[in-house]
Amino acid sequence: MDVTRLLLATLLVFLCFFTAYSHPPPEEKLRDDRSLRSNSSVNLLDFPSVSIVALNKNSKQISRKEAEKKRSSKKEASMKKVARPRTPLSAPCVATRDSCKPPAPACCDPCAFCQCRFFRSACSCRVLSLNC
């Protein structure tokens, strides 16, 4: 019985030493601001200063008017887009979403292009830009 207690005691001591030495040492804490500034990866002086400006009612109304003008001009610009003249279709061409493997001719749609996947084993004519 004394032998088993002795073995258990040595095992307990061994486990205590093992757990104590297996943990990494605690990191040293930075004690002053100088070491914090030198060790930090982000320098606060790199960022621009922020200026606060008070807005009055006139400036708010002007900005709203400008925003409305921008919105209306964007809408008019999108409505006024001129369609490009399309090139005449050549007889040997590939329709959209059909196979266009490299020896095949070009795609019929001028806005389409041949997109290949799986190491150029599966190719098809695709149209990505709707505004073309």
From Swiss-Prot:
Covalent S-S links between cysteines: 93-108, 100-114, 107-125, 111-132, 116-123
Keyword Glycoprotein applies: yes
Agouti domain mapped to chain residues: 93-132
Keywords, comma-separated and alphabetical: Disulfide bond, Glycoprotein, Knottin, Secreted, Signal
Signal peptide range: 1-22
Location of this chain's protein in the cell: Secreted
Segments for region (Disordered): 61-87
InterPro entries to which the protein is assigned, alphabetical: Agouti, Agouti_dom, Agouti_dom_sf
Biological processes annotated in GO: hormone-mediated signaling pathway; melanin biosynthetic process; melanosome organization
Major location category of this protein: secreted
UniProt-annotated glycosylation sites, renumbered to this chain: 39
Comp. bias (Basic and acidic residues): 63-79
PROSITE patterns attached to this UniProt entry: AGOUTI_1, AGOUTI_2
Molecular function terms, GO-annotated: melanocortin receptor binding; neuropeptide hormone activity
Organism domain of life: Eukaryota
GO cellular component terms, semicolon-separated: extracellular space
Function: Involved in the regulation of melanogenesis. The binding of ASP to MC1R precludes alpha-MSH initiated signaling and thus blocks production of cAMP, leading to a down-regulation of eumelanogenesis (brown/black pigment) and thus increasing synthesis of pheomelanin (yellow/red pigment).
PANTHER family named in the record: AGOUTI RELATED, AGOUTI-SIGNALING PROTEIN
Domain notes: The presence of a 'disulfide through disulfide knot' structurally defines this protein as a knottin.
Protein name: Agouti-signaling protein
Taxonomic source organism: Macaca hecki (Heck's macaque)
